[in-house]
Amino acid sequence: MAKVAVLMADGFEEVEALGVVDILRRAEVDVDTVSIKEEQVVISSRNIPVRADKTLTDMDYYDMIVIPGGAGAWTLRDDDRIISLIKKYDHEERYIAAICAGPMALGKAGVITNKKVTS
C-alpha cells in the first residue's frame, strides 16, 4: 500500500493539506500529516490548531510527499531539511506533489527545471 506524508508548517492552508488527507484516507491510502516543527501541533492559516500524526524527525519511508500552500509554504521553502527531502525524493524518483504556493519549495530545490509543472 502506498504511503503519503503531508508536510505541514504553521500557516498551512487547511483545505490544501487536510482535503488531501481526507480524500486519500477515503481511498484507503496510508497518509500521515507531518509537522516540520519539534512539536506535533501546527497552526493553520485560519488559526486552527491541528495535531500532526508525526514530526519531521519521526518520518518513516513514504512513497510520496505533499507540500500544501498557504503562508506555511514559505516556511517549507526556507527550511533546508525540506529542500534536502525534496531533492532526495526527486533523485529516488518518488512522487512529489505541491499545491498553490507549495511549488516554490520545488523551485528552490531545483527539481522542476526544464519540467512542465501545474499548480
Where are these predicted regions, by residue range?
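Extended, subdomain-level signal for the structured scaffold at the beginning of enzyme domains
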Residues: 1-92, 96, 104-114
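Active-site oxyanion/phosphate-handling segment shared across diverse enzymes
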Residues: 118-119
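Catalytic, metal-anchored helix/loop core of enzyme active sites in primary metabolism
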Residues: 100
